[in-house]
Regions:
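Active-site core segments that coordinate phosphate-bearing ligands/cofactors
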Residues: 1-128, 137-161, 168-180
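Glycine-rich Rossmann NAD(P)(H)-binding loop
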Residues: 131-132
Length: 180
């Protein structure tokens, strides 16, 4: 029941083995937060694409000198989300600039992604993660993901619909074995 409450689903592979998938849609939350930041700090909607990781700021976040106050606005408050963000202290107006508030958003979204990934991973020894979608171009996200997933191999793909493509390749391979 815990998996279902956190939107982690179990599927059956073509080899009759259980495959877990944790569905997590960060894009809508990101769009919502960017819109809010753009409004507060009077920035163009594409301004965030110019932001590189601020290593000093990130270091302060990791060692607790800066508290992460991000709180998701559009993501369902599942038990996992409630564990990560027990209270809503998110107020982007208190940050000195767009960049600081943006790093808070990406910090929170990265933590959500990592928790979702680890939920799906369960006890599996897998240490290779494939990432596709719009976040592969977000350098702050990638930097934080590498830190939170130290010991994992991260592969990034620009290929659209990578999961669907991977499934299609697997089915094609299986069909070819039966036909030949």
């Amino acid at each position: 029941i815990s998996d279902l409450q956190n939107d982690c689903l179990n599927f059956l592979s073509i080899h009759s083995k259980t495959v877990k998938a944790s569905r997590f849609f960060l894009g809508y939350e990101m769009d919502h937060q960017l819109s809010r930041l753009n409004q507060i700090f009077k920035k163009d909607e594409r301004y965030y694409k110019k932001i590189n990781p601020d290593l000093t700021l990130i270091s302060k976040m990791f060692d607790g000198r800066i508290e992460n106050t991000f709180y998701p606005a559009t993501i369902e408050k599942s038990p996992m989300v409630k564990d990560l963000f027990p209270e809503d202290k998110w107020n982007p107006e208190v940050y000195a600039n767009y960049e600081e508030a943006y790093h808070q958003v990406i910090w929170g979204l990265t933590r959500l992604q990592v928790a979702s990934l680890k939920l799906a991973q369960g006890n599996s020894p897998i240490r290779k993660v494939y990432i596709d979608g719009g976040f592969v171009h977000n350098q702050v996200f990638i930097h934080l993901l590498r830190h939170f997933l130290e010991g994992y191999t991260l592969e990034f793909s620009d290929f659209p619909l990578g999961s669907a493509y991977g499934a299609a390749l697997m089915l094609e391979e299986t069909n070819n074995k039966f036909i030949n």
